[in-house]
Amino acid sequence: MESENIISAADKARILAEALPYIRRFSGSVAVIKYGGNAMTEPALKEGFARDVVLLKLVGIHPVIVHGGGPQINAMLEKVGKKGEFVQGMRVTDKEAMDIVEMVLGGHVNKEIVSMINTYGGHAVGVSGRDDHFIKAKKLLIDTPEQNGVDIGQVGTVESIDTGLVKGLIERGYIPVVAPVGVGEKGEAFNINADLVAGKLAEELNAEKLLMMTNIAGVMDKMGNLLTKLTPKRIDELIADGTLYGGMLPKIASAVEAAVNGVKATHIIDGRLPNALLLEIFTDAGIGSMILGGGEDA
């Protein structure tokens, strides 16, 4: 594989020189990273992600991690003999399932990410949206072809985010790692799509960047070519002609909404590539798709 080729000393020097203006430009800014897909499950990619996050912090960027955990939740539900059920791609989450979701996301997955970042020299702290009730949620009702407003249990959408807790951690030099669990008006837990939480958090933090790690190269056209720079108008065209559909739509919607609402740029990148974060942020070409809030496509 190309990623396994040995990089010469000259190439390393060139890469560092190319990165320097980006380091200067983004130092002091916030980058919200949605962490999911293969990058969360393959040991080498998990270690590489942790190292990259620590490096971002070392060069003055403030990373904030929002993670998923679908495969880990499925594995635990299977272990306890509870079958997963989905409506329109959303997990049906009754009280028993929510207890398991919260245990897996806020316990195992969150703490594993925190531990790995800290192992490589970072100072990460894990939080859930229920901590300080900083992510307020409301029940999400799903429309299906047969019925509108289907109740799928303790699945929520973001009602509001109080960034005080996260900003306080950043100001003290920590790397916040956020489990996407929100709290309802009665104190009940809600499972929230991690892409949605990442997008809303990036907006509220006035982040320079929102980076969504996926198992695809980025946004592709009908011919399978990577579209490296997009605007909301172009995204609408790709949805209208059927190029974008299915499970990609919620991710795209969160990315576009963040870009429109003040995040300087949102990026959809291939988390299966080693050093994906660094390649997207610190190289001229990047590796994924960048969505800008306005202007013309490049």
UniProtKB/Swiss-Prot annotation:
Site (Transition state stabilizer): K34, K251
Reactions this protein catalyses: N-acetyl-L-glutamate + ATP = N-acetyl-L-glutamyl 5-phosphate + ADP
Origin: domain of life: Bacteria
Any single biological process term in GO: arginine biosynthetic process via ornithine
Pfam families: AA_kinase (PF00696)
Family note: Belongs to the acetylglutamate kinase family. ArgB subfamily.
Identification of the protein by name: Acetylglutamate kinase
Pathway entry: Amino-acid biosynthesis; L-arginine biosynthesis; N(2)-acetyl-L-ornithine from L-glutamate: step 2/4
A GO molecular function held by the record: ATP binding
Organism name: Neisseria meningitidis serogroup C / serotype 2a (strain ATCC 700532 / DSM 15464 / FAM18)
Enzyme Commission no: 2.7.2.8
HAMAP family membership: ArgB
Role: Catalyzes the ATP-dependent phosphorylation of N-acetyl-L-glutamate.
GO cellular component, as recorded: cytoplasm
Keywords linked to the UniProt accession: Amino-acid biosynthesis, Arginine biosynthesis, ATP-binding, Cytoplasm, Kinase, Nucleotide-binding, Transferase
Binding site for substrate: G69, G70, R91, N191
Subcellular location: Cytoplasm
